[in-house]
Curated annotation (Swiss-Prot):
Pfam families registered for this protein in UniProt: ABC_tran
Signal peptide annotation: none
Record-stated family: Belongs to the ABC transporter superfamily. Zinc importer (TC 3.A.1.15.5) family.
Record lineage: Bacteria, Pseudomonadati, Pseudomonadota, Alphaproteobacteria, Rickettsiales
The protein, known as: Zinc import ATP-binding protein ZnuC
InterPro entries noted in UniProt: AAA+_ATPase, ABC_transporter-like_ATP-bd, ABC_transporter-like_CS, Metal_Ion_Import_ABC, P-loop_NTPase
Gene (name only): znuC
Domain of life: Bacteria
Catalytic activity: Zn(2+)(out) + ATP(in) + H2O(in) = Zn(2+)(in) + ADP(in) + phosphate(in) + H(+)(in)
Keywords, comma-separated and alphabetical: ATP-binding, Cell inner membrane, Cell membrane, Ion transport, Membrane, Nucleotide-binding, Translocase, Transport, Zinc, Zinc transport
Family annotation (PANTHER family): METAL TRANSPORT SYSTEM ATP-BINDING PROTEIN TM_0124-RELATED, ZINC IMPORT ATP-BINDING PROTEIN ZNUC
EC number: 7.2.2.20
Amino acid sequence: MQKPIIEFRNVSKKFGNKTPISKVSFIVKKNNITTLIGPNGAGKTTIVRLMLGLEKPTSGEVIIDRKLKIGYVPQKFGLTTDIPITVKKFLDLLAPSHFNKNIKEISSFIDLEHIKKQEISKLSGGQFQKVVLACSIINNPDLIILDEPLQSLDVTSQQEFYQLIHFIRKKLNITVFMISHDLFTVIKNSDQVICLNGHICCSGVPHEITPNSEFSNALSSLGFYTHNHDHKH
């Protein structure tokens, strides 16, 4: 059995009197797309901060290979969209000199060639997300963590974004860990789904989310309604 790229073992985290996550256990398999879903305040941000080493667990273990390279795209990227800089110059600034040779290949992967001369301020929401995705893979990571990457994107842009995620995962052999609120697109595009609400409510593969299943009932109790969609993956 292949060793997981990340493993949480009975992890709890306290901040003063608050315990955002309690006794959380799960694994992230190499080269899979794993999606974490849950309501606001469920502890999703705490999970990401533990993965990135920004926090240490109060109890339990977070097991990550020290050599693992991680690309991270936060929910709020922190890039002002009105800066007067082109897409190409922006990516060149981000990449260390020995990675500059990869810029053209990455731009081709993410379909940025036709917009590389445009200013950041002129990009649509979907185009901007492609730039953000390029930022996350520019240094050849083993794992990318995407925090709500589909937020504010229309349906077409969401579909295009997932197509790129699948392409990058296959082409570059990158593992993807994503946070999302959109259960329908998650079911269609993930290898593993983890539902969090301070603890792990349910976890499994998308085809297990069938009407009246334990997985489906747990999701429904948190407001994720599953019975109106075709869930074939």
